[in-house]
Amino acid sequence: MRAQPAASHFVDGRPLEDETGAPIPVIYPATGEEIARLHEATPAVIEAALASGARAQAAWAAMRPVERARILRRASDLIRARNEELSLLETLDTGKPLQETLVADWASGADALEFFAGLAPAVTGETVPLGQDFVYTIREPLGLCVGIGAWNYPSQIACWKAAPALALGNAMVFKPSEVTPLGALKLAEILIEAGLPPGLFNVVQGRGAVGAALVTDSRVAKVSLTGSVPTGRRVYAAAAEGVRHVTMELGGKSPLIVFDDADLESAIGAAMLGNFYSAGQICSNGTRVFVQKGIKEAFLARLAERADAIRMGDPLDPEVQMGPLVSQAQLEKVLAYIEKARAEGGRLVCGGEASVSPGCYVQPTVFADVTDAMTLAREEVFGPVMAVLDFETEEEAIARANATDFGLAAGVFTADLTRAHRVVAQLQAGTCWINAYNLTPVEAPFGGVKLSGVGRENGRAAVEHYTQVKSVYVGMGPVDAPY
């Protein structure tokens, strides 16, 4: 099998196999070919990962931040040097075209390692003067963290979680999605090669039961999950039993509002990126595209023209712009949503069919005349299916954009920047864009509100989610006691 790793797991600095665990076949979504076969972590593997992480963390936390940073920076350099090889593996694992993985996946992971390497030595406490006495604070690592990844950006997510955790003195046990398990193993290898002490970043494979075993272990201080809302609810509840720190980056049904003074080509380009990039499998996608009535038909006509020109096919072809969905199960789910949109009265503008057999392909699909009550406007599809809704006034657009239980992201396109800032200030979303969409630089915090999650990935804000504050009162004079 062309992508078979040395072992299913990576624990305490080396590959680890236990074939008594349930098999995990890894399928290349473009052909249905099995490219690797891994095994779920057994209780013994889980214990080895947690024990080695807990054991290694204290010495790592005691290391000077600049020394930790040096290791992470080396890992970032190694990733960049091997970007082509790693991107090929990412394409095999996810089905995303090389045109994407070469620029968006491991590249962002390398950025995260580099950013947090640079930030780590600058994380300091504060001094609070109290006359003769004073208080100083220390930011301390939380300890042993658990990261749980999603299948859409497996390697990027692994890096986004590992980078702040390790930079700030924590250890991490990471469980990738069982659908895309390969990239995290490469990250673990690279970190060891860069000089990371064994045990600090362990990778274990498995389905929900493995995640539950990790999240509920008494040694775990923090859980960071990227996943669906139902999974997030379960993990959040399990973590709450031990009063653990949590970061939850969950699903979305994000609005993209296009006013009639917007640059039409840019707005259409953003809507396409926010619905068709990675075959629509991005949590922050702007899948509810609100277009002001006066430009709706012009918007739809040009959108259909550009969508029909998207080149689909073999993800290993560097000219291909859109690959398959990640699995047969995801294909069936997306096709069911398309049929429901038809049945509920959506006007099909383009696409709407499975495409490019064999493989899990769906055409870029656009429905117009979608109403807020339709399933397509309420539920996360996670596929290349765009819902276009029309609106008349700014106030209407804001109210309807916020009429959802999700709150991950939102976008506004307009030539009036005063209006743009005014609208963004009222949108209930953790991450917003003005005249852009789905750009997530690691320097900026990313995360949602409402059912889309708690906490933030990336940026300086992530420091608060991987450290805790110790407050130290220093008395400089005699103690004045009343007894």
Swiss-Prot record:
Record note on cofactor: Binds 2 potassium ions per subunit.
Sorted UniProt keywords: Metal-binding, NAD, NADP, Oxidation, Oxidoreductase, Potassium
Keyword Thylakoid: no
Transmembrane segments: none
Active site positions, chain numbering: K161, E249, C283, E457
InterPro entries assigned to the protein according to its UniProt record, in alphabetical order: Ald_DH/histidinol_DH, Ald_DH_C, Ald_DH_CS_CYS, Ald_DH_CS_GLU, Ald_DH_N, Aldehyde_DH_dom, BADH
Residues at which NAD(+) binds: G149, A150, W151, K175, P176, S177, E178, S228, V229, P230, T231, G251, C283, E380
GO molecular function, one term: betaine-aldehyde dehydrogenase (NAD+) activity
Binding site for K(+) 1: I27, D93, V179
GO BP: any one term: glycine betaine biosynthetic process from choline
SUBUNIT field: Dimer of dimers.
Biological function: Involved in the biosynthesis of the osmoprotectant glycine betaine. Catalyzes the irreversible oxidation of betaine aldehyde to the corresponding acid.
HAMAP family on file: BADH
Name recorded for this polypeptide: Betaine aldehyde dehydrogenase
Organism: Cereibacter sphaeroides (strain ATCC 17029 / ATH 2.4.9) (Rhodobacter sphaeroides)
